[in-house]
Curated annotation (Swiss-Prot):
Native source organism of the sequence: Pasteurella multocida (strain Pm70)
UniProt similarity note: Belongs to the flavodoxin family. MioC subfamily.
A Pfam family the protein falls into: Flavodoxin_1
Known function: Probable electron transporter required for biotin synthase activity.
UniProt GO MF annotations: flavin adenine dinucleotide binding; FMN binding; oxidoreductase activity
Cofactor: FMN
Name this polypeptide is given: Protein MioC homolog
Domain Flavodoxin-like, chain residue ranges per copy: 5-144
An example Gene Ontology CC term for this record: cytosol
PANTHER family from the UniProt entry: NADPH OXIDOREDUCTASE A (PTHR19384:SF128), NITRIC OXIDE SYNTHASE-RELATED (PTHR19384)
Record key words, sorted: Electron transport, Flavoprotein, FMN, Transport
Length: 147
């Protein structure tokens, strides 16, 4: 049986949600069990074994408001996540010096909790990428090959 993938989206204007929904459709077509969560709370996802976090960067390099509570609670929770495998897709704007800092935040926090990063994160510059769904789709095999 294929690995269940919990896709967690952090979005302010909807771009990350569109990417996540597109990736979820592709994974389902390939018979992966998928759980798509737009801004879940801690209890809803803490026991999942594989996270694909799709997030934009908001404000001064912060996580979007809809996933900030999840990662804030995780940061102060004593639970280690040695059983969790993860990858991150980030959307950002390279005009800002905080380009894709939300990706960095997610990576650093999950690694500090002993989670295993499956592959290099995808950092998309929305100034140059016109089709983020397609770009994420092109990255997806890199993620899947590590499951």
């Amino acid at each position: 049986m294929k690995t269940k993938i919990c896709i967690i989206t952090g979005s302010t204007l909807g771009g990350a949600e569109y990417v996540a929904e597109h990736i979820a459709e592709i994974l389902e077509q390939q018979d992966y069990p998928v759980r798509l969560e737009h801004g879940p709370n801690f209890e809803e996802v803490i026991d999942e074994k594989c996270w694909l976090v799709v997030t934009s960067t908001h404000g001064a390099g912060e996580l979007p408001d809809n996933i900030k509570p999840l990662f804030e609670k995780l940061a102060f929770h004593p639970k280690q996540l040695a059983d969790l495998r993860f990858a991150v897709i980030g959307l950002g704007n390279s005009d800002y010096d905080t380009f894709c800092h939300a990706v960095d935040h997610v990576e650093q926090l999950l690694l500090s909790k002993d989670a295993l990063q499956l592959c290099e994160s995808l950092r998309m510059d929305m100034l140059t990428i016109t089709d983020p769904e397609h770009t994420a789709e092109q990255w997806l095999p890199q993620f899947l090959s590590q499951l």
